[in-house]
Structure formats: structure tokens, C-alpha cells
A protein has these predicted regions:
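ABC family nucleotide-binding domain
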Residues: 1-166
Length: 166
């Protein structure tokens, strides 16, 4: 059992950091919040939606909760712009042009607009992580979850990712 008797409430706009040693349940906690990991007891509610309720449409909930993983999880065979657009088109129903425009605005926000037509393998780890953050933001999430977003980066790349996160 990783988590026992934990309870918290996060208000809109708050930034919360969960710290602890390896194996203490940090990743499990955020995966439970997004419905990616089942939990045995307790309740998790996101924007009034119960994650543990069998009637909850977890796909719809996940489309509203931004999640950025430790290893970026970008599609290597797709351009950066396509990585930012695909979920907007397939999940949110945006037009390709609308999704591309939103993606380009977010790439500009994270300082990577000049790399829009490149592929993930052509970017540094810090750049890929900023693309992953932009991709999550493109979905207009109600909250953002980050799973060790800087642990796979070289020390000199950490600050550029942290600057984008806040």
C-alpha cells in the first residue's frame, strides 16, 4: 500500500508540489487523479467529477486534465506541430487549422515556434519537454499534472522547463 489516509484540496490557480523519496507514491497519486491508476479506498474529485465513480467517463475527464510525463511521450514520426494538433482534432473536434494555430501560439509561448516543423528527435530533451507542456496546454486543461518533468534532463536544461511550468 503506497498511500494511506491522505487528503488534500487544490484550488484553481494553486501550485502544489508533492515531494518524497522514490517509491513513496508520487507518480501513483497523480496517475490516480487522472484515472490512469485505480485506487482501492477514498475519493478523488476533479472539478466536481468523481474519478472513482464507475459512471464517470474517464476519457472525457482525461481530456480535461493535462499530464506531462517524465519522458515526454511525443510521437517520434510526427512533426512538432502535428504532435500539438492531433489530440485537439481527434478529442476536442477542432479543425486542423484551428489546432495548428493554437499549437503555434503555444510553441511561441514556450520559445519554440521556430522548431514547429521539426521532429522530436531533432530537439534537445529540454525542448521536447517544453513541447510536451505545450501539447498538454493545447487541450485547455482544468489542471496540469507533471510527473518528474525535469528528472530526465541535463542539469542545464532544468531551468528552461521550470520557467515554462510556472
Amino acid at each position: 500500500q503506497v498511500l494511506t489516509d491522505c487528503s488534500t484540496q487544490v484550488k484553481k490557480g494553486e501550485v502544489v508540489v508533492v515531494c518524497g523519496p522514490s517509491g513513496s507514491g508520487k507518480s501513483t497519486l497523480i496517475k490516480c487523479v487522472n484515472g490512469l491508476e485505480p485506487f482501492q479506498a477514498g475519493a478523488i474529485t476533479v472539478d466536481g467529477i468523481s474519478v472513482g465513480d464507475p459512471k464517470t467517463n474517464l476519457s472525457k475527464l482525461r481530456s480535461r486534465v493535462g499530464m506531462v510525463f517524465q519522458h515526454f511521450e511525443l510521437f517520434p514520426h510526427m512533426s512538432i506541430t502535428d504532435n500539438l494538433s492531433i489530440a485537439q482534432v481527434k478529442v476536442l473536434g477542432r479543425s486542423k487549422d484551428e489546432a495548428r494555430d493554437k499549437g503555434l501560439k503555444l510553441l511561441d509561448r514556450v520559445g519554440l515556434k521556430a522548431h514547429a516543423d521539426k521532429f522530436p528527435g531533432q530537439l534537445s530533451g529540454g525542448q521536447q519537454q517544453r513541447v510536451a507542456i505545450a501539447r498538454a496546454l493545447a487541450m485547455d486543461p482544468i489542471c496540469m499534472l507533471f510527473d518528474e518533468p525535469t528528472s530526465a534532463l541535463d542539469p542545464e536544461m532544468i531551468n528552461e522547463v521550470l520557467d515554462v511550468m510556472v
